[in-house]
Amino acid sequence: MPSTARAPRPRLPSAPFPELPAWASGPDWALHAGDCLERLAALPETSVDLVFADPPYFLSNGGFTCHSGRRAPVGKGTWDASRGIEEDHRFTKGWIEACGRVLKPSGSLWISGTQHVIFSAGFALQSLGWRLLNTVTWFKPNASPNLSCRYFTHSSEILIWAAPRRPGRLQHHFDYPRMKAENGGKQMRDVWALPRPGDEELDADGQGRIWTLTSPRLEEKAQGKHPTQKPVALLRRIIEATAPAGGLVLDPFSGSGTTGVAALRLGRRFLGIEQDPTWLALARARLEAESDGAGPAGDSFGPRRSRTRG
């Protein structure tokens, strides 16, 4: 049976954090409490290597969903309530613009979302003059069924990878050699297959078509559960590919701190922004456990071998 012990975390090169008072912090991470637009405005320009954003999907407006096989109201919090399509888009465009200000010339931005918000984000990026680098589909094999039986089950999310458009050749960081090595010596495509350990290949021709990752495992929620928590494995691939070693990763909607957990394990530094005290406390517990090497052994990346073929 393979060992569940986690390999030692990579040592970080010495690099200062932006000089801002943090709600909580460790040697390689900091959490800032408050509105993301206000906190982003306080950060120095060109100080961040990578932004991963999982913004509100604006779904908490009295609707219903399926939770553990039962009908349940969609009520994640006031932060997820829509204020109307125009105001929602104005907010989306505002935080994207704020992220662009703090990105280094080699920096880039990832946005995760469903159809409820991702097209607004894409239009905002285009209207701000960003370069759309890739879109990726994240397939959830354990997605909840739909209740109305009037449309297909929502079993995927879209991720946009983009960078501010700058004069000259592309400058954004991309670890092409590492991604190619992980893909068996072939160029990695913008649609990946990352099956669960033990799964068989998903395609008859061996070509990976989408990122196949389950929702966060129970071990990843050992210290608490966030309603929109992302799996650590998803963030591992993103950060490993697009943030330099020792670089600063920013999450303006940090929630339970998953981005920070993945960043620390990969030898990157992390700065998170969150306005909800409950999720700040959860993120702090996870990051402190990670810094101390006491995080749950199961809250890991899983096997390093990737079944991506395309």
Tell where the protein language model's regions lie, with residue ranges:
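Well-ordered alpha-helical segments embedded in enzymatic catalytic cores
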Residues: 39, 94-95, 234-238
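Class I S-adenosyl-L-methionine
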Residues: 2-17, 27-30, 45, 52-53, ...
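Short conserved loop adjoining the S-adenosyl-L-methionine
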Residues: 39-45
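A short acidic-Thr-Gly-centered motif at the start of a beta-strand
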Residues: 20-25, 41
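Conserved phosphate-coordination/catalytic loops
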Residues: 31-34, 82-93, 225-233
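Conserved SAM/SAH-binding loop
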Residues: 34-38, 304
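Conserved Class I SAM-dependent methyltransferase catalytic core
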Residues: 84-141
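SAM-dependent methyltransferase catalytic-core segment centered on the flexible catalytic loop
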Residues: 47-108, 266
